[in-house]
A protein has these predicted regions:
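Charge-dense, helix-prone N-terminal extensions
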Residues: 30, 106, 110-113
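Short, structured helix-loop element that forms part of the nucleotide-activated donor/catalytic region
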Residues: 103
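Beta-rich strand-turn-strand
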Residues: 95-100, 110-112
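Acidic, Ala/Val/Gly-enriched low-complexity intrinsically disordered segments
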Residues: 136-137
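C-terminal structural segments of small proteins and small subunits
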Residues: 114-119
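Conserved small/polar residues in nucleotide/adenosyl-binding loops
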Residues: 127-132
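Ribosome large-subunit tunnel/peptidyl-transferase-proximal elements
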Residues: 1-78, 83-98
Length: 137
């Protein structure tokens, strides 16, 4: 008989990750595993029992090769001919935290569960502890 974890049995931890000189994709895979709860032996894909992740020094994140200048992010406004594109370089100048959030978001499942799990990612430019009552592991 399969035993499932109840909501009352879930204890979320806080992880602090330093992104200084980290590669975006490699860091995003580590964060995604923690947020989804895949590092836990009680993982089940239909439940949210992942941990919180705080990422600091996000302004020092990097890409390998020429992806920082050449990679394209596409989005659509919803209007005819409304495709917009930007590079990580331009996005990093405006919102440095958005580069990592996009990478993690695209590794999570699409839907309500993915949105809930993405809210467990906290990206800090000027680092302050997001939850003083919880200990950061």
């Amino acid at each position: 008989m399969t035993k499932f974890v109840k909501k009352s049995e879930i204890n979320c931890k806080w992880y602090e990750i330093d992104a200084k000189n980290a590669v975006v994709g490699r860091l995003a895979t580590i964060i995604t595993k923690i947020i989804r709860g895949k590092n836990s032996p009680k993982f089940s894909p239909h439940m949210d029992h992942g941990d919180f992740v705080v990422v600091k020094n996000i302004e020092h994140i990097k890409f390998t090769g020429n992806k920082f200048e050449n990679k394209k992010y596409y989005r659509h406004t919803g209007y005819p001919g409304g495709i917009k594109e930007t590079t990580p370089e331009k996005l990093h100048q405006k919102k440095p935290e958005e580069v990592l959030k996009l990478a993690v978001k695209r590794m999570l499942p699409g839907g309500a569960l993915g949105k809930k799990q993405l809210s467990k990612l906290k990206v800090c430019l000027l680092y302050t502890s997001p939850s003083p009552r919880d200990s950061v592991v």
